[in-house]
Structure formats: structure tokens, C-alpha cells
Design a protein with these regions (language model features):
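Short amphipathic alpha-helical elements of helix-turn-helix/winged-helix folds
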Residues: 20-25, 37
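DNA-recognition alpha helix
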Residues: 30-43
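Short coil turns linking two alpha-helices in DNA-binding domains
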Residues: 46-47
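Short alpha-helical segments that sit at the start of domains
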Residues: 1-20
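Non-DNA-binding regulatory cores of transcription-related proteins
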Residues: 62-64, 68-138
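Basic amphipathic alpha-helical segments that dock to polyanions
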Residues: 50-60
Length: 138
């Protein structure tokens, strides 16, 4: 019984460490980045464990999973906001503009009740426009 409790505690510690890694970065990392970050404090954690826990955290609304260009990125900011994806450097930026007016207009026009708004804009970021670089932060 003590072994089971210890195992569950370990899973909880792993999940909290994974959650912390996602929430404490401004980038929108993929599972491999999270795995490398978590390994700094938990060297024995497997990539499979990170994938499973990211899935559980996303399913429970503790983080958001963002699908773009065939890859899943994770976002620790769960409040409604928009994203901008730079097609040159493949960086995802948070856009923190109020979308209440937009949501309100859509609700008025359609008579739907909107509970979540997912907006992904694509283009070339300011840095890439000036530097023509292909480096992303995650």
C-alpha cells in the first residue's frame, strides 16, 4: 500500500513539474521541449510520461493544446486570448487584445452563446521582417 501511495505521489510531482514548465515560459513549447526542461529537475522522467501528463493537463483545462502545422504546442495561459504564428521562424505569440467586442458582435448576429474563442493568425513577425531569421524560442 505504501508503494502505491508513493507511486501516486511521484505521478503528482511529475504532473506538477510538467505544469510548472509549461506555465513558466512565454513560448508555446512542444512536448520535447517540456521533456528537456523537466529532465533538469527529474532526470528519469520519460518522454512518454510527459506526453501522457500534457494530455491529462489539457483535458482538464489546466493548459491549452494548440494544433498548428501538424504539431501540438502547449500554452499555460488558459484565459481567452488570440495567437499569432510566424510562418518564417515558427514562433507562436500571445496576442492580448480584448476580444469581448468581437465575441459580443458574433453573439448578437448569430444568437449563439460563445464560451470560448480560438483565434490563430498567421504571418511574418516583426523580427523576421527585419532579420529574415529562422530561429524560434522553443
Amino acid at each position: 500500500m505504501a508503494q502505491v501511495k508513493n507511486l501516486m505521489k511521484n505521478f503528482s510531482q511529475q504532473r506538477e513539474t510538467i505544469l510548472s514548465a509549461v506555465r513558466n515560459t512565454r513560448c508555446h513549447p512542444r512536448a520535447e521541449w517540456v521533456h528537456n526542461k523537466v529532465k533538469e529537475t527529474m532526470p528519469n522522467v520519460s518522454l512518454g510520461t510527459v506526453y501522457r501528463n500534457l494530455g491529462v493537463l489539457a483535458e482538464n483545462g489546466r493548459i491549452n493544446a494548440i494544433q498548428i502545422e501538424g504539431a501540438t504546442h502547449y500554452d499555460g495561459v488558459t484565459e481567452m486570448h488570440q495567437h499569432f504564428y510566424c510562418t518564417a521562424c515558427e514562433t507562436i505569440y500571445d496576442i492580448e487584445l480584448s476580444n469581448k467586442t468581437f465575441v459580443s458582435k458574433v453573439e448578437q448576429k448569430t444568437k449563439h452563446h460563445i464560451t470560448e474563442s480560438l483565434v490563430m493568425m498567421k504571418g511574418i513577425c516583426e523580427l523576421c521582417q527585419t532579420q529574415k531569421t529562422k530561429e524560434n524560442q522553443c
